[in-house]
């Protein structure tokens, strides 16, 4: 069976209604994307914590519907637009979707990733390229963090250079658990991973078991009291600013912290918030993203 993708762009306030109508009228699947992705106008979907969502949600959406090649896309879209209450049918383009071995195609897109000196992030269907590598076996899944994003890479490089045997580590916003697992493989003692998403917590636990890494995971309310030798948080700039006092309090005096999920243009603003507690600066930049790192002062 052959398929086509129907692609339409429209204001965000109409995207959800149109996507629902397309599904009701026979589309096989529908996704909504930020039409401004990878441009200066790109925005978080629901807005970062601390900002007004109405001002930061996607302003321009792209609706992509997978349809059977026998369906008339113009008729389908017109009916969906009418069902959604749109004043007119959006303009659209069609993309042919070739038959594929989707499992093989997906696997081909995820090759082993070399990070730092000895780190390799390796999907389960590959072998580590180096016999002496520090290997993290990780498949793409529900939670953020496979090593491909610049912020994850930066944090991993920092951890490889920073973690000392037996140190305690907190990974706040752990996603897939990749940073927590790496910390453990670098010789850390007690390692804790925290995330607001229960699915991420479950994914991280699964990944830790696969990598034989003894890491404790939980939601924010499960975060243990006390301080850590190392804290790493790869989130976004606004949550990092909102949580500055809390995250800084989790670092032992003299301990180290690394922050990422921060664009280079946001670095000074984030650093200024943490400067009250931490001697902090840009540690490294990669593809427009930075990792801020510093040491908690003995008293503040």
Swiss-Prot record:
S-adenosyl-L-methionine binds at residues 152, 173, 195, 234. GO terms for cellular component: cytosol. Keywords: Cytoplasm, Methyltransferase, S-adenosyl-L-methionine, Transferase. The lineage of its organism: Bacteria, Pseudomonadati, Pseudomonadota, Betaproteobacteria, Burkholderiales. It comes from Burkholderia mallei (strain ATCC 23344). Gene3D superfamilies: Vaccinia Virus protein VP39. InterPro entries: Ribosomal_L11_MeTrfase_PrmA (IPR050078), Ribosomal_PrmA_MeTrfase (IPR004498), SAM-dependent_MTases_sf (IPR029063). Coiled coil: none annotated. It catalyses: L-lysyl-[protein] + 3 S-adenosyl-L-methionine = N(6),N(6),N(6)-trimethyl-L-lysyl-[protein] + 3 S-adenosyl-L-homocysteine + 3 H(+). This is Ribosomal protein L11 methyltransferase. GO terms for biological process: methylation. It is an enzyme of class 2 (transferase). Its main location: cytoplasm.
């Amino acid at each position: 069976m052959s398929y086509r993708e129907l692609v339409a762009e429209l204001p965000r306030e109409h995207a959800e209604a149109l996507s629902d109508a397309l599904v009701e009228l026979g589309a096989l699947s529908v996704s909504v994307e930020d039409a401004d992705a990878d441009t200066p106008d790109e925005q978080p979907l629901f807005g970062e914590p601390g900002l007004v969502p109405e001002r930061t949600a996607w302003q321009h959406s792209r609706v992509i519907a997978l349809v059977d090649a026998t369906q008339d896309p113009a008729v389908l879209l017109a009916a969906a637009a009418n069902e959604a209450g749109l004043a007119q049918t959006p303009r659209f383009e069609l993309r042919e979707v070739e038959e594929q071995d989707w499992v093989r195609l997906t696997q081909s897109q995820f090759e082993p990733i070399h990070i730092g000196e000895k780190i390799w992030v390796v999907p389960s269907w590959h072998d580590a390229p180096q016999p002496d590598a520090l290997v993290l076996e990780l498949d793409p899944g529900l939670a953020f963090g496979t090593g491909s994003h610049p912020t994850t890479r930066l944090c991993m490089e920092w951890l490889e250079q920073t973690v000392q045997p037996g140190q305690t580590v907190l990974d706040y916003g752990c996603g897939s658990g990749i940073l927590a697992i790496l910390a453990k493989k670098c010789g850390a003692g007690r390692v804790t991973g925290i995330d607001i998403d229960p699915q991420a917590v479950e994914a991280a636990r699964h990944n830790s078991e696969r990598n034989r890494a003894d890491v404790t995971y939980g939601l924010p309310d499960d975060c243990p009291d006390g301080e850590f030798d190392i804290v790493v948080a790869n989130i976004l700039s606004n949550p990092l600013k909102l949580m500055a006092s809390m995250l800084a309090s989790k670092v032992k005096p003299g301990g180290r912290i690394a922050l990422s999920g921060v664009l280079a243009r946001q670095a000074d603003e984030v650093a200024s918030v943490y400067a009250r507690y931490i001697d902090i600066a840009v540690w490294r930049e990669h593809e427009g993203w930075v990792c801020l790192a510093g040491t908690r002062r003995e008293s503040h």
